[in-house]
Amino acid sequence: MPNNKVKENPMSLSPGAKFRLAVKTHHPLQIVGTINPYCAMMAKSIGHQAIYLSGGGIANASYGLPDLGITTLNDVLVDVERITNACDLPLLVDIDTGFGGAFNIARTIKAMEKAGAAAVHMEDQVAQKRCGHRPNKAIVSQQEMVDRVKAAVDARINPEFVIMARTDALAVEGMDSAIERAIACVEAGADMIFPEAMTELKQYEQFSTALRSATGKPVPILANITEFGQTPLYSGEQLAAVNVDMVLYPLSAFRAMNKAAENVYRHLLEHGNQEALLDQMQTRKELYAYLHYHEYEDKLDQLFSQPS
C-alpha cells in the first residue's frame, strides 16, 4: 500500500520538535557549541543540524567569569535570544541547576521556550556548582533532582520542548547511583539523559541498557566530548556503537578561537605588524558571506537609490 503520511516540514516545526527530529534522524547527532550568533550562523552554513550554548562558555566569554554557578538566568537569556534571532537551528541550552527552586525553575523553562530555545539540560549538582569535569563536585539528593525535573516538565508550554536531565553522580557516588538517578529523572518526565564526565566507553551502553530495561523505551543519551576533561575523545562511530544518540562538542570552536586570538595578540606585541598572520585569518569576503552582507547592501540601494 502507498504511504500517504505527509512528511513533516522542518521549517514548520517548533524548535523542540526540530531538535527531536534531528536526534531521531542522525546517528549520532553532532551538537556543536556556538558561543555567539555569528558562530551559530557559521555552523548552520557549514551543515550542522543542532547547536549548543554552554553555561561555562557564557560565564567565560560574555562575563569574564569562571564556570562556578555565578551567572544568572537573565545573563543566559541575553545570549540565547541573540543566537535564536540570528539562526534557526535547534539550540540546546545549559541552564546549570535551573537557577533556584521549583518556581525559579518554572520561570527558567518558560523564559527559555519564549526565547526560542529547543532544549535545555539541567543537572543534579548543588546550587554552588562546579564545572562537570573538575574535582570536588557536590550533588543534591536524588529526590531533589527528581523534584527539579518535575518542576521543569510541569512548566513547559509546548510538550515538544526538550527537558534533558544531567547527572554528575558518577564522580561523586559511582555508576550505580548515576544510573538510578537517570532512571528516576526519566520516570519524572525527562525526555533525554546527559551522563556527565564518563570515563569509559562502555558506561554509555550501561546507561542505555538500564534505561531501556527500567522504562520500557529507548531514552536518547548525550555524550559530552569536551577537550581536556575526564572523558576520552571518542569518535562518533565509537559512540554510536554504544547507543549514544547525541555527541556534544561544547567549547571546541571557542577554545580554538581563544588560542588564535592569543597568538594574534602576542604576535602584534612582538612584531608590531599582522601581515605574517593574514593567511591564518578569515578574509573580509569570507566574513561577509556568512552574514549575507551584500544582500543588505543591495536592499539599501533598492530603498534609497537616487533617481537618475
Swiss-Prot record:
| Residue positions binding substrate | 54-56, 131-132, 166, 196, 224-226, 255, 284
Pfam families for the chain: PEP_mutase
E.C. numbers:
4.1.3.30
The GO biological-process annotations, alphabetized, read as: propionate catabolic process, 2-methylcitrate cycle
Specify the pathway. Organic acid metabolism; propanoate degradation
Cofactor dependence: Mg(2+)
EC class of the enzyme, as a word: lyase
**What is this protein for, i.e. what is its function?**
Involved in the catabolism of short chain fatty acids (SCFA) via the 2-methylcitrate cycle I (propionate degradation route). Catalyzes the thermodynamically favored C-C bond cleavage reaction of (2R,3S)-2-methylisocitrate to yield pyruvate and succinate via an alpha-carboxy-carbanion intermediate.
Q: Which family does it belong to?
A: Belongs to the isocitrate lyase/PEP mutase superfamily. Methylisocitrate lyase family.
- Native species of this protein? Vibrio cholerae serotype O1 (strain ATCC 39315 / El Tor Inaba N16961)
Keywords of the record: Lyase, Magnesium, Metal-binding
User: Superkingdom of this entry's organism?
Assistant: Bacteria
Q: Which gene encodes it?
A: prpB
Q: Which reaction(s) are listed as its catalytic activity? A: (2S,3R)-3-hydroxybutane-1,2,3-tricarboxylate = pyruvate + succinate
Fetch the InterPro entries from UniProt.
Answer: ICL/PEPM, Isocitrate_lyase_ph_CS, PrpB, Pyrv/PenolPyrv_kinase-like_dom, Pyrv_kinase-like_dom_sf
Q: Name one GO molecular function term.
A: magnesium ion binding
Task: Describe the protein's quaternary organization and the partners it interacts with.
Answer: Homotetramer; dimer of dimers.
Gene3D superfamilies (UniProt xref): Phosphoenolpyruvate-binding domains
Could you tell me what this protein is called?
2-methylisocitrate lyase
Q: Where does Mg(2+) bind?
A: 94, 96
The record ties this protein, via HAMAP family, to:
PrpB
